[in-house]
Amino acid sequence: FAKMIHARNTAYSECSSTGPASVDILKSFIPENELFPPTPGGAWEDHHAFGAWDAEPDSHLLLSMMEKYFGKAENLDQLIENGQFIQTAGMQCLFEEGRRQKPYCSMVLTWCYNEPWPCAAGGSAISWPLKPKPAYFAMKQSCRPVMTTAQIQKLLWTEGEEFKNAIWLLNDSFNEI
C-alpha cells in the first residue's frame, strides 16, 4: 500500500497482487494428501504457489504475508480466505490509486487477467477454468465511473497509532456531481 501511494508513474503496467485459487479449484488438481498445509515441492509448487518469482521464494501464494496479517491458518478454507482477502485489497489499491493519480497516470494494467491453466496461486483476477476470484469484483468496483475511495496507508495498525487517510471522490463520467 505504501509503495503504491508514494509511486508516481504515468502508467502501471504488468502490476498485480497475488492470491490463491478457490478451494474447489485447488481440489480439482492438487492431491488430497498435499492440500493442507501447502508446502514447497509437489503439486503446490508445480502449479506456481511457490518459486514462481525469484524475488519472492514463497510466491505466488505468499504464506509469509498471510501469516503477518492473520497468523497461521488452521485449515485450507481459512488459508484461501486470508490469501484472497490480501489479493483483493491489493488489487483495489492498485486500481484506485492509479485513478487518484489521474491525469498524470493514464492506465493500470494487470499482469495476468485470467489463468490459462490450473494455477494454485497467481496474480490473475479469474482462475482457471474461468472462475472469478474476489479480486475480480474489487477491480470491477474500482473501475466504475463515479466512486468514493479512501487512500489507506497500510493494512496493519497498532494500538495507539494514529490512523490517517484521504477520502477522494472520483468522477470519470461526463456528468458533474
Predicted regions and their residues:
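Substrate-binding clefts and catalytic carboxylate motifs of secreted carbohydrate-active enzymes
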Residues: 2-177
